[in-house]
Amino acid sequence: MEEQDARVPALEPFRVEQAPPLIYYVPDFISKEEEEYLLRQVFNAPKPKWTQLSGRKLQNWGGLPHPRGMVPERLPPWLQRYVDKVSDLSLFGGLPANHVLVNQYLPGEGIMPHEDGPLYYPTVSTISLGSHTVLDFYEPRQPDDDVPMEQPRPPQRPITSLLVEPRSLLVLRGTAYTRLLHGISATRVDELDATSLPPNATACKSALPGAHLVRGTRVSLTIRRVPRVLRASLLLSK
């Protein structure tokens, strides 16, 4: 078994059963006061730090990941504290996380199914702030020779979905990271099935059968490790 597929001893009580391996969901990883503090810091960041994308906007901290290596930038103390807290769980092969992507999603915004790619150590950890969301997991699309290219394909259905509440920590490793795609639908209300709740429902206070969960503004701190790091002088010389 490869190292990235190994279970995390510190998080075993929070492993999500009945879900692709390996997914850990930790409710109330931070306190309400910490959540409020982090939201203040995020929204007090200088305007040039924000990048507007279709369906969300983001801040990049720690450097810009690059195939030739990332030129590291010092994380601000308000972020470093939580990067250290996540790194202490030994998620990144015994090395510390060094990169944080801050995403803001307004109600009705989401992100298409995607994979995080080879620039990162194959583990992703996310602290959620402000609002819940539902994270959907998908099998990668396979070429279908029977469907003409010009014919639209039916919408892909997720193989499973997790309810992600504010102040939680979500960790994806193994198959959940390396093979599956994950995304967030662009909706304002998440309706929970009355007969089939998300596999992490027992850890979510709002996961009630038939619940209609109205999304607010959500901020996520996606904490990862970029293995390949360069000094600025080396990058500029290439």
Curated annotation (Swiss-Prot):
The family database entries (InterPro entries) matched by this protein are listed as: AlkB-like, AlkB-like_sf, ALKBH6, Oxoglu/Fe-dep_dioxygenase_dom
Cofactor(s) recorded for this entry are: Fe(2+)
MF term (GO), any: metal ion binding
Family matches, as Gene3D superfamilies: Alpha-ketoglutarate-dependent dioxygenase AlkB-like
Q: What class of enzyme is it?
A: oxidoreductase
User: Which cysteines does the record link by disulfide bonds?
Assistant: none
Q: Which UniProt keywords apply?
A: Cytoplasm, Dioxygenase, Iron, Metal-binding, Nucleus, Oxidoreductase
Query: Where would you find this protein in the cell?
Result: Cytoplasm; Nucleus
Family statement drawn from the similarity comment of this UniProt entry: Belongs to the alkB family.
What function is annotated for this protein?
Answer: Probable Fe(2+)/2-oxoglutarate-dependent dioxygenase involved in oxidative demethylation of nucleic acids. Binds nucleic acids with a preference for ssDNA or ssRNA to other types of DNAs. May play a role in nucleic acid damage repair.
Official protein name in the record: Probable RNA/DNA demethylase ALKBH6
Q: Which organism is it from?
A: Mus musculus
Q: What is the lineage of its organism?
A: Eukaryota, Metazoa, Chordata, Craniata, Vertebrata
